[in-house]
């Protein structure tokens, strides 16, 4: 499993689809709070016709990626896009998360619930993110 550079995912006709926003995780509720706000904003912006979007954490917080994938699979979701809320593709996204995804896919396949899971590149690599950060830094330094 490798990180996909393209946001496009090929879906089988009639398949149910969802997205998981994946954050690193922390035991500090103050660190977690902005992710709940972000999820609410995305859901509101996408409206009722948007792709179902959930939040998961790689470690140190709940729901875990595994729990979220299993919940979605149990609800009949057959295609999941994972959008990492990371600044760059470090060790976690290059090694740890792909191993987690592969294990989840194998477990679900063995249980008779195959799910296609697509790992996308981290949002921090998107040009809009770099532009937004640059603008904030420039504003703060003026």
Predicted regions and their residues:
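Active-site-proximal alpha-helix that buttresses catalytic centers in soluble enzyme cores
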Residues: 1-142
């Amino acid at each position: 499993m490798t990180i996909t550079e393209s946001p496009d995912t090929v879906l089988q006709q009639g398949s149910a689809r969802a997205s998981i926003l994946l954050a690193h995780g922390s035991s500090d509720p103050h660190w977690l709070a902005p992710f709940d706000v972000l999820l609410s904003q995305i859901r509101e912006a996408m409206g009722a016709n948007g792709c179902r979007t959930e939040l998961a954490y790689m470690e140190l917080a709940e729901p875990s990626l595994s729990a979220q994938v299993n919940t979605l699979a149990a609800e009949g979701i057959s295609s999941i896009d994972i959008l990492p809320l990371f600044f760059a593709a470090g060790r976690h996204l290059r090694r740890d998360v792909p191993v987690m995804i592969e294990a989840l896919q194998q477990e679900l396949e063995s249980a008779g619930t195959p799910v296609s899971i697509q790992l996308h590149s981290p949002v921090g690599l998107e040009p809009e993110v770099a532009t937004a950060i640059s603008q904030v830094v420039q504003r703060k330094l003026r």
